[in-house]
């Protein structure tokens, strides 16, 4: 099915539009998400979010190249998830180090004054 036919299905709000999009560009969308997000579950969620975003944006938008449009959405959503994941872990090294340090420092009651 050609891009303009799939876009017409989106304008009709036919659920078949998602099926056709998955059939034609699903592998490319999944590759984009998987290359950015190494975790398979995160990549799968990004792919699902991509389909939902495309569904919500068409209409009113009418992309000329549906594959590039969908992959760009997948890329942006994947990068957003990647940055959120890495931001959460940014100081986790210090948390672990402080926990280990806490175990090695003697309690105040055992220190001689």
What are these regions (language model features)?
Residues 1-3:
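Acidic, Ser/Thr- and Pro/Gly-rich low-complexity regulatory segments
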Residues 7-8, 19, 30, 34, ...:
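Solvent-exposed, non-membrane alpha-helical residues enriched in polar/charged side chains
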Residues 13-14, 39:
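Short loop-to-helix capping motifs
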Residues 22-40:
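Amphipathic, Lys/Arg- and hydrophobic-enriched alpha-helical face
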Residues 31, 45-52, 56, 64-76:
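Structural recognition of an alpha-helix C-terminal capping motif at a helix-to-coil junction
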Residues 58-64, 85, 89:
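Short alpha-helix-to-loop micro-motif enriched in aromatics/charged/Gly
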Residues 75-93:
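Arg/Lys-rich amphipathic alpha helix in sigma70-family domain 2
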Residues 99-113:
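Acidic, proline/glycine-rich intrinsically disordered inter-domain spacer in sigma factors
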């Amino acid at each position: 099915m050609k891009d303009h036919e799939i876009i017409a299905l989106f304008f009709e709000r036919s659920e078949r539009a998602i099926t056709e999009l998955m059939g034609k560009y699903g592998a490319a969308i999944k590759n984009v998400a998987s290359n950015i997000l190494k975790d398979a579950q995160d990549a799968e969620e990004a792919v699902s979010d991509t389909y939902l975003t495309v569904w919500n944006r068409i209409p009113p938008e009418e992309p000329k190249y549906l594959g590039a449009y969908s992959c760009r959405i997948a890329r942006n959503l994947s990068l957003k998830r990647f940055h959120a994941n890495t931001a959460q872990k940014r100081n986790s090294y210090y948390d672990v180090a402080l926990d280990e340090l806490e175990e090695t420092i003697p309690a105040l009651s055992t220190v001689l004054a």
